[in-house]
Amino acid sequence: MKKGDLRRQAILDTAEALFFERGYEETSVQDILDAMELSKGGFYHHFESKMAVLEAVSARRAER
């Protein structure tokens, strides 16, 4: 797996955990960034929005 793919998966893992813990509405992109010590640019390189992350988390869970 490429470094970018690993970063994308890490964002999804972190977001999924925060969505479960706090709920989607109560989780901000900044919360995800803070939990990962990730820059906004690093986040937006992989996802265009928090909704895009939710869609990717949902798709990944549907594949399991």
Show the residue positions of the predicted features.
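Short helix/strand-capping hinge loops at secondary-structure junctions
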Residues: 18-27, 47
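Short hydrophobic/aromatic patch on the recognition helix
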Residues: 36-47
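Alpha-helical structural segments
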Residues: 6, 10-17, 21, 35, ...
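Residues within the helices of the helix-turn-helix
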Residues: 30
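Nucleotide phosphate-binding site architecture
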Residues: 25, 44, 63
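Short, flexible segments with low predicted structural confidence
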Residues: 3-5, 24-25
